From Swiss-Prot:
Low complexity biased stretches: 243-257
GO terms classed as biological process: clathrin-coated vesicle cargo loading
Keyword tags: Cytoplasmic vesicle, Golgi apparatus
Function: Mediates clathrin-dependent trafficking of vacuolar cargo from the trans-Golgi network (TGN). Promotes plant growth.
Organs and tissues of expression: Expressed in inflorescence stems, stigmas, roots, roots meristems, embryos, and floral and leaf vasculatures, but absent from the floral abscission zone.
Changes seen on gene knockout: Abnormal vacuolar trafficking of soluble cargo proteins, and premature termination of the shoot apical meristem and of floral meristems. Plant missing both AGD5 and MTV1 are severely dwarfed, develop short siliques, exhibit abscission defect, and have altered subcellular distribution of clathrin-coated vesicle (CCV) cargo exported from the trans-Golgi network (TGN).
The keyword Transcription regulation appears for this protein: no
Protein name: Protein MODIFIED TRANSPORT TO THE VACUOLE 1
Biased composition (Polar residues): 520-536
Species per Swiss-Prot/TrEMBL record: Arabidopsis thaliana (Mouse-ear cress)
């Protein structure tokens, strides 16, 4: 019975080991490891040996995953299962040592990674098995004051938290000897460094900022060359001044900064860090910083800010610039005015930030430089050492070259002084037939495209060439030898004045003399020695003296006498047409349309009756026209007064279509015209009978 119970218990213990070291790529749960440790710690020695055998058998498994889990179980249980299990593992440590050079089959997916994990875990297990018992006792309950620690490298060295004296907190007092003594005292409590000068690995300290670049000696500190060849930045604030110092003083002050940080540096580290989501500090954080900084030493705060501006991390420099900008905006304060003066004399760090490839850092640095320069944005051009040469402005070529000079003032001066153009200007676009007469023009007569009325002249005496003179320079016939030197030919004026043409020889033929050979008066054309040319202005003009004065009548001069030289044709109206002659009226109306006046109409009817009574007196004119049927202009050749009425009895003219009078209204037939027709018929019949 006892044997069966022991067998069941043994099987149950083996199942516990198999569950922790299963061939699955999963980490064994910690609570199962704790159950095994509790069982080993409270069991008999025989049961502990049985557990050890089960675990060592799992080391012989072919799977590298099982081997690694068995080694991890041994490593974990050695420190928590008591001394009996440790002694058993020490007796059988050969099985663990054989896995130092384990080389199994490479995994198709992970390759040799699993085999390498077995080798590394074997080394760690041997180290845990043969470690001192005092260091491997079960962990006592942790005190509340102990800080939280995580897993990491075993070579991690916690930086010692040295107690700082009161003198290390004092800033701005004492002499250089006191500070040198403080630095020597601080050096004695520093952890020892390697003799070769390289510092050992120091992990992050959770009590301080993760971005403190001055925690070790290998921090970034750019070298600055002074005028005297010395280098380094002066951190000595004893005399209240700043400037360049020697390299030894820089190193000693750097050692003081490493050991004992001032209140200003501590305050600055609370806001100037590289961590965090925000690139710039919040407004509330800056407000709290300004309130605290107003109570501190401005010189030490300036030096601390200058150190942050030399940080290798651009995030730290960005936040330092934000803090400096907030301080500069409060420069009315006496304490912050010292910071303004300090950075006005030390612009190197800010100008280096202005040259950063980070756009946000560059913009912030330029803004700080503008505040330092009194609100004027200087950027990179503020320092003589970092001046950037501006590229010379390249004049673009004139793509639309009109030939005009860009210097309009010179053109105006040339016009005022009356200077002449030495060379011929380009021909205007409208001057197709331009000649060489334009070369002699002065600059005062120069045309410009800006003045559309430059060529318009309201004085007939000015001799100025028109811009639209398409026929300037064209001559028809021979040129006169007496042409003026600079006379510009005018447009062809058919109806204009020809005073100049009368002075030409009589045999000259001119384009202006189109009507020269036409004659209206037959006698004038047959006289000897008479000129064969008629001036254009006299073509339709009235003569100065007439042998017969036409009486005035309200009909518009239709019944009046016609002037000599006028074409005697019934298609043209007689006399002078009134000013209100309508546009749609025909050329041969009985009288022109006028506003209706009934008094005048009564007199007109009386004149018509008189006109019809005198019709019989004109029979002889009809006989004369019948004899000279081929001559239209036969009347009035004797030089006397011509007939005042149209030749209505001319038989050679075709019948005229009835004309419209009074604005197109059709004239009604009357008995008076029927009487005229009957009278003419009877007169012709009488002539035939006789």
């Amino acid at each position: 019975m006892d044997t069966s119970r022991r067998a069941v218990e043994s099987y149950w213990r083996s199942r516990m080991i198999d569950a922790v070291t299963s061939d699955e790529d999963k980490v064994a749960p910690v609570y199962k490891l704790e159950e095994i440790c509790d069982l080993l710690r409270s069991s008999h020695v025989s049961i502990v040996k049985e557990f050890s055998e089960f675990i060592l058998k799992r080391l012989d498994n072919k799977s590298p995953i099982v081997k690694q889990k068995a080694l991890r179980l041994i490593k974990y249980a050695v420190g928590k299962s008591g001394s009996e299990f440790r002694r058993e593992m020490q007796r059988n440590s050969v099985a663990v040592r054989n896995l130092f050079h384990y080389k199994g089959h490479p995994d198709p997916l992970k390759g040799d990674a699993l085999n390498k994990a077995v080798r590394e875990t074997a080394h760690e297990t041997i180290s845990a098995i043969f470690s001192e018992e005092n260091g491997t006792k079960p962990a006592a309950p942790e005190s509340i004051n102990r800080r939280i620690e995580g897993f990491g490298n075993t070579n991690f060295q916690v930086p010692s938290n040295d107690n700082k004296s009161f003198l290390s907190e004092v800033v701005g007092i004492g002499s250089a000897s006191i500070k040198q003594g403080i630095s020597n005292f601080a050096q004695g409590h520093l952890p020892k460094k390697n003799e070769n000068g390289s510092s050992s690995y120091r992990g992050p300290n959770l009590h301080r900022s993760l971005t403190m670049e001055n925690e070790n000696f290998s921090r970034y500190d750019p070298v600055k060359l002074g005028k005297d060849g010395n280098y380094g930045t002066s951190k000595n604030t004893t005399g209240g001044s700043w400037g360049h110092a020697s390299g030894e003083a820089s190193e000693s002050s750097a050692s003081v900064r490493v050991e004992s940080k001032t209140r200003e540096e501590k305050l600055l580290e609370t806001i100037v860090t590289s961590g965090g989501v925000r690139l710039q500090p919040t407004r509330d954080a800056l407000h709290v910083f300004i309130l605290e900084a107003a109570k501190m030493d401005a010189v030490a705060l300036s030096i601390a800010l200058d150190g942050k501006l030399h940080s290798p991390m651009w995030q730290v420099r960005m936040k330092a610039l934000c803090v400096l900008e907030a301080i500069l905006r409060k420069k009315e304060d006496e304490n912050f005015s010292i910071v303004h003066t300090y950075f006005s004399e030390n612009l190197d760090a800010i100008q280096r930030c202005a040259e950063s490839p980070q756009s946000s850092l560059r913009e912030k640095a330029n803004k700080v430089l503008s505040l330092l320069n009194g609100g004027q944005s200087s950027g990179l051009m503020s320092s003589s050492d970092n001046t950037v040469k501006r590229e010379a402005a390249v004049d673009l070529p004139d793509l639309i070259d009109t030939g005009d000079s860009d210097d309009t003032l010179n053109n105006l001066n040339a016009i005022d002084t009356g200077s002449t153009v030495a060379t011929a200007g380009p021909l205007m676009d409208d001057d197709w037939f331009g000649d060489s007469s334009d070369i002699g023009l002065s600059s005062s007569e120069k045309k410009t495209d800006d003045d559309p009325f430059a060529d318009v002249s309201f004085h007939p005496n000015e001799e100025k060439e028109s811009a639209d003179d398409l026929f300037s320079g064209m001559t028809v016939g021979e040129k006169s030898a007496a042409v003026g030197g600079n006379h510009v030919p005018d447009l062809f004026d058919m109806f204009g004045s020809t005073a100049k043409l009368e002075a030409e020889p009589k045999d000259a033929k001119n384009i202006n003399d189109l009507m020269g050979s036409f004659s209206i008066d037959e006698n004038n054309s047959n006289q000897k020695g008479s000129s064969s040319s008629t001036l254009p202005q006299d073509l339709f003009a009235m003569p100065s003296t007439t042998s017969h004065q036409a009486p005035e009548n309200p009909v518009g001069g239709i019944l009046g006498s016609q002037n000599p030289g006028f074409i005697q044709n019934t298609m043209l109206p007689g006399g002078v047409m009134p000013f209100n002659f309508p546009q749609g009226m025909m050329m041969n109306p009985a009288f022109a349309s006028q506003p209706l006046n009934y008094a005048a109409m009564a007199s007109l009817l009386a004149q018509q009756q008189q006109y019809l009574g005198n019709m019989s007196n004109f029979q002889q004119f009809g006989n004369l026209n019948a004899q000279g049927s081929g001559n239209v202009l036969s009347m009035g050749t004797s030089g006397g007064n011509q007939s005042a009425l149209p030749d209505i009895f001319q038989p050679n003219f075709g019948n005229q279509a009835p004309t419209s009078t009074m604005n197109g209204s059709k004239k009604e037939d009357t008995r008076a015209f029927d009487f005229i027709s009957d009278h003419l018929t009877s007169a012709r019949d009488t002539k035939r009978v006789s």
